[in-house]
Amino acid sequence: MNRRRFLGYTAFGSATVLSGSAPFGCAPFEAPGDAPASDEPFELHEATVADLQAGMESGRWTARSITEAYLARIDALDGRGPELRSIIETNPEALSIADALDAERRSKGPRGPLHGIPVAIKDNIDTHDRMTTTAGSLALEGSIPPRDSFLAEKLREAGAIILAKANMSEWAYWRGLKASSGWSARGGQCRNPYALDRNPCGSSSG
């Protein structure tokens, strides 16, 4: 399998903001016999943040079109195909945020290098929006923090689009050291995109 095909399996956004890690082994787990994702081309899967900014500056892409592409990619890889379970939930306001940032770019120019760039953040990073923050647990299901975390606040100020909450090892491994890496009650078992019968290792598995 070549590098482009590997990248095509794993890409869902241009940047992923993660916190924390844990030095545990990548043990195999019992996985359903899903076929890998199709080889249909995904135009943005190797794009860097600089590439995306250049594309928006030239008019080739907009924040909305990029966001739509990554939402479709999440659906293709998490909801169908290999079912990576890398994402716990997506932001229902992502497209309206993208539209507002496109309008701002037209009227004032970009705020900076993250303007209009979709990012996914770990599910233990507070966001005050229509997404919940649960550390992957059912105990906190439905929990909406009263304010953004410092990280989320700074991302929004920079013009980034908080696209989704990434799956993680529940409670960032505080539920037990023998727990499977990348498993949470809300997200299920996150799968290693390079070897679908193995886990992705670490707390920040999504």
Model-found features: residue ranges?
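N-terminal secretory signal peptides and thylakoid transit peptides that target proteins
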Residues: M1-S14
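Membrane transport/envelope proteins' first extracytoplasmic loop
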Residues: V17-L18
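Gly/Ser-rich catalytic/binding loops embedded in alpha/beta enzyme cores
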Residues: P32-G206
